[in-house]
A protein has these predicted regions:
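Residues lining hydrophobic/aromatic ligand-binding pockets adjacent to catalytic sites
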Residues: 1-252
């Protein structure tokens, strides 16, 4: 049976997590194995800045357990530079690399710019250009995009509206696909910092459980408050709250 609530972090290769999460003396080539013994999913975040090669994606596929899932953040060239315009060539390049993950490729995240007002026509054309054999999530950083017209477009194309917590800004809870996607960037107004309290984690877990009740087949939760290793520590905590142990994470 597929895991209903999958918990992980945005990236795993952080030297400053040695001590708080990884063993202090862990080598760089040991980090992914350590991570996958505790979580069943990870969000590849560095692909936003630099797209890894297909060979690299394939190596990650081969180094992880059979049930492991990679979410991949799409290139900023698509979302920030081109602003979703004429995406065909950029999407082709992206998938020629990311498809190296094979069956372990999970949702693709498109994070839109924070100061770009709603453009429904651009979104409509972009959604129509997406290959149909993948799952997609959209993190809409400008609140102007929180509009019924956009939600309807996402629903029409079975794309998830990312529920996020970012520097005091939160997006609406709305299920627009058969899965849900949650990104937690930190509980404070300082980006990527701070540790969520147990009470705050329970609130976010309730969001995930609500998505399940609303019909979501799976909910992906990724922590991005990477300073001092808080992302990994919070991910472990909420995973335990959800009723999963480290040893169960990759047995589904």
């Amino acid at each position: 049976m597929a895991e209903k609530i999958l918990v992980g972090t945005s990236g795993w290769h952080y030297d400053h997590w040695k001590g708080p999460f990884y063993p202090q003396q862990a080598r760089s080539d040991e980090l992914l194995d350590f991570y996958t013994r505790r979580f069943s999913t990870v969000e590849i975040n560095n692909s936003f800045y630099h797209l890894p090669s297909r060979k690299t994606f394939s190596a990650w596929r081969d180094a992880t357990p059979p049930a492991f899932t990679f979410a991949v953040k799409a290139s900023r060239y698509i979302t920030h530079m081109k602003k979703l315009k004429d995406p065909e060539k950029a999407l082709e390049k992206f998938f020629s690399c990311a498809d190296g993950l094979g069956s372990k490729l999970g949702p693709i995240l498109f994070q839109l710019p924070p100061r770009w007002k709603r453009n429904a026509e651009r979104m409509r054309d972009f959604l129509a250009a997406l290959p149909e054999n993948h799952r997609y999530a959209f993190e809409l950083r400008d609140p102007d995009w929180f509009h019924g017209e956009i939600f309807s477009l996402l629903e029409k194309h079975y794309c998830a509206l990312c529920l996020f917590d970012f520097a005091g800004q939160k997006s609406p809870h709305r299920l627009t696909a058969e899965f849900a996607y949650i990104r937690l960037h930190g509980p404070s107004h300082q980006k990527y910092a701070g540790r969520y309290t147990k009470g705050q984690l329970r609130q976010w877990l309730r969001h995930a459980e609500k998505f399940i009740r609303e019909g979501a087949e799976q909910v992906f939760i990724y922590f991005d408050n990477d300073q001092q290793g808080y992302a990994a520590l919070n991910a472990l905590e909420i995973q335990q709250m959800a009723g999963r142990t480290c040893s169960q994470a990759n047995e589904s």
